[in-house]
Amino acid sequence: ESWVGPLDGVRDFEMGTGSLEVKATLSAVGFPAKIGSLEQLDDSARQPLFLAGARLRQTDNGQSLPELVADMRDVVAGYAEPVRLLSERLIAAGYFDAHADRYVRRFALADIRVVEVKDDFPRLTPGSVPLGVTKATYEIDLDKVLGPSIPTADALKKLGAI
């Protein structure tokens, strides 16, 4: 239930009173995170808010998207509601089993960064832009964001997910 991004959620995951936005990059230079709206990093309604960046690299030894989907399905196998929710979210995200043979690229996780979005985090929000600015997309370089990356498990604990 927490994966709400494919259902037009403002952020990818909502857990407890907080949320988690996940960005992926293939870039070897910097750690770019493309932000899709003014609301995406606005923590005024849900706290805590975390931004996770996953650096992937394309490699023959990596995992394909259909393999990752199969792994996720294995995790929820035997639980009717999670199976239904995962299938619903995958379709909403544009993943269809009939197209699995088209996903030939393989990726490995090279690095992950998880940062808590707080007052000093560089971001644009509806309350921080001039009157009249109603939409914006922008990019943040996570290599240049002040503050430490925290372990994923720590963020999930703070969100009440584990």
Describe every region a protein language model picked out.
Residues 1-9, 25-162:
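Nucleic-acid endonuclease domains
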